[in-house]
């Protein structure tokens, strides 16, 4: 257990009713995986993108659930508990980023990916958009996806291991393996359809949980006066601006820049039935996100008073939601709330596994086999896609076996990597006729390298100068934008077909 005190440990330890709820939840996921296998895995496009047949509501909640991960239920409440309301800047940045993403990226990406050779992966879209016959952009972008998503996926497995260790007193490694088995099963067999349906189901569970826990906590404490009590305990607890710096606020706000380049999120826009359904998806998706994030912040704030009043010593702030849900609720409801954490974790892992698998298959294996042969070996590529899910999962499990960082930091590193490498390129690809192959490649590589260099060598110098401690997406994003623009200005453009395609995309989106 991550809670000190034997009497408390006995209160928090999961009962048989909790186990029943978790078993029911796992059974539902396995059934959905089987359903997805029977319905829509006849070819690689169906396995990876659901045949572009997903409705607006599944699109909205699957995008939200795959986006938020265990970070929303474990990482964010833990951060608010530790630092106070100033941690809320990240929720503002993310909400704005997601909202802009639905307007700026979603409609054009849905239309353009189908127009550009029916691309089913982001690297495939970049290749077709820039007429990259040498496949350099496809290979490099595919490599970035594999590297950063393996890092991202392993953060999900860390969350799963922590959950079972904290709530069930189970060994961290056994918990990690249990989560891995279930998520690999329904992703391996059910593909994109199963992942999207499970994400929708899990998104509903997550929302209910993020509303229930803070409301019941307030009832258990002093109602709305609890927030006054939290403010009295420490002045920075209820102040957006205290306990942080201008640079700290900018860094948290900058998380929103990453949305335009997250493959597991924007692939949802590619799979929706029609771009005309995106407004419906946006309204539901943003509402879900804002309510969920505010709930997570409320859990963190009420948790400050809750933990103090009950004299609990919390070793790991990221287990706050687990502790509160197990003490405040009947074991059956507590089991449901633990399932919500699993939902958050597994929805993201499955989406990331699928995107990484599609990149390995579409962007590497097909390339090795050759385009002509690729068309004649659909069943072979479907099997390679499934095996890729397994391989990436095994590597991520191996990395997660010895966790040495917080969930928020792990997610932050991967988020910054994608945001710096892909966000500028996605925007330029959808809006700028002057983008060149060389500019795209240079900007993408520069963004990824700056993020890695900042994490490894610059950030450790934050004690010398605060500027070095800024979130790595900021220098990475700026470096990528500047490099892409100036290199494109002085290198050869793809050709007149780009102008034609961009005009056509613009026209279709307006219809």
From Swiss-Prot:
Main location class: membrane
Q: Which InterPro entries is this protein grouped with?
A: Na/Glc_symporter_sf (IPR038377), Na/Pro_symporter (IPR011851), Na/solute_symporter (IPR001734), Sodium:Solute_Symporter (IPR050277)
Which keywords fit this entry according to its UniProt record? Amino-acid transport, Cell membrane, Ion transport, Membrane, Sodium, Sodium transport, Symport, Transmembrane, Transmembrane helix, Transport
Recorded catalytic reaction(s): these are: L-proline(in) + Na(+)(in) = L-proline(out) + Na(+)(out)
Give one Pfam hit by family name: SSF
User: Any coiled-coil ranges, and where?
Assistant: none
GO CC annotations on file: plasma membrane
GO molecular function terms listed in the Swiss-Prot or TrEMBL record: L-proline transmembrane transporter activity; proline:sodium symporter activity; sodium ion binding
Q: Name one GO biological process term.
A: proline transport
Q: Does the keyword Transport apply?
A: yes
* Localisation per UniProt entry: Cell membrane
Membrane topology qualifier: Multi-pass membrane protein
Chain segments annotated as transmembrane: 16-36, 54-74, 85-105, 139-159, 175-195, 204-224, 246-266, 286-306, 327-347, 381-401, 410-430, 438-458, 467-487
Q: What does this protein do?
A: Catalyzes the sodium-dependent uptake of extracellular L-proline.
Family per similarity comment: Belongs to the sodium:solute symporter (SSF) (TC 2.A.21) family.
Q: Mind telling me what this protein is named? A: Sodium/proline symporter 2
Tell me the organism.
Staphylococcus saprophyticus subsp. saprophyticus (strain ATCC 15305 / DSM 20229 / NCIMB 8711 / NCTC 7292 / S-41)
């Amino acid at each position: 257990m991550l809670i000190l005190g034997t009497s408390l440990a006995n209160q928090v330890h999961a009962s048989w009713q909790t186990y029943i709820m978790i078993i029911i939840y796992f059974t539902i996921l396995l059934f959905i995986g089987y359903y997805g296998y029977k319905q829509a895995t006849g070819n690689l496009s169906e396995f990876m993108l659901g045949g572009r047949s997903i409705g607006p509501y599944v699109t909205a909640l699957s995008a939200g659930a795959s986006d938020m991960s265990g970070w929303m239920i474990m990482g964010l409440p833990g951060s608010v508990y530790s630092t106070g309301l100033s941690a809320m800047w990240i929720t503002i940045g993310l909400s704005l980023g997601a909202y802009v993403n639905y307007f700026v990226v979603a409609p054009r990406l849905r239309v353009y990916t189908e127009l550009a050779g029916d691309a089913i992966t982001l690297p495939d879209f970049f290749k077709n958009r820039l007429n990259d016959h040498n496949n350099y952009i496809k290979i490099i972008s595919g490599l970035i996806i594999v590297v950063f998503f393996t890092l991202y996926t392993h953060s999900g497995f860390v969350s799963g291991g922590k959950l079972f260790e904290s709530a069930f007193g189970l060994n961290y490694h056994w918990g990690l393996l249990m989560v891995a088995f279930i998520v690999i099963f329904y992703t391996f067999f059910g593909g994109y359809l199963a992942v999207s349906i499970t994400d929708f189901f899990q998104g509903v569970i997550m929302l209910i949980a993020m509303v229930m826990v803070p409301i019941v906590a307030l009832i258990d404490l002093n109602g709305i006066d609890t927030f006054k009590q939290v403010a009295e305990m420490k002045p920075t607890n209820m102040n957006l601006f205290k306990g942080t710096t201008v640079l700290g606020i900018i860094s948290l706000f900058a998380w929103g820049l990453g949305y335009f380049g997250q493959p597991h999120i924007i692939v949802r826009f590619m799979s929706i039935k029609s771009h005309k359904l995106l407004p419906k998806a946006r309204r539901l998706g943003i509402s879900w996100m804002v309510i969920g994030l505010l709930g997570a912040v409320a859990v963190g704030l009420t948790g400050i008073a809750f933990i103090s009043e009950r004299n609990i010593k919390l070793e790991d702030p990221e287990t706050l939601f687990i502790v509160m849900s197990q003490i405040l609720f009947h074991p059956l409801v507590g089991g449901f709330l633990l399932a919500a954490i699993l939902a958050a974790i597994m929805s993201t892992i499955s989406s990331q596994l699928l995107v990484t698998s599609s990149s390995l298959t579409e962007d590497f294996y097909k390339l090795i086999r050759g385009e002509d042969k690729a068309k004649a070996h659909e069943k072979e590529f479907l099997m390679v896609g499934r095996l890729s899910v397994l391989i990436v999962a095994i590597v991520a499990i191996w990395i997660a076996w010895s966790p040495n960082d917080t969930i928020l930091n792990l997610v932050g590193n991967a988020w910054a990597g994608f945001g710096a490498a892909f966000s500028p390129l996605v925007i330029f690809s959808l809006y700028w006729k002057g983008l060149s192959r060389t500019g795209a490649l240079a900007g993408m590589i520069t963004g990824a390298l700056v993020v890695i260099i900042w994490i490894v060598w610059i950030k450790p110098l934050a004690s010398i100068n605060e500027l070095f401690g800024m979130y790595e997406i900021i220098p990475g994003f700026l470096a990528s934008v500047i490099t892409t623009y100036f290199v494109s200005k002085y290198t050869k453009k793809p050709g007149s077909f780009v102008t034609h395609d961009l005009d056509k995309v613009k026209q279709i989106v307006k219809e």
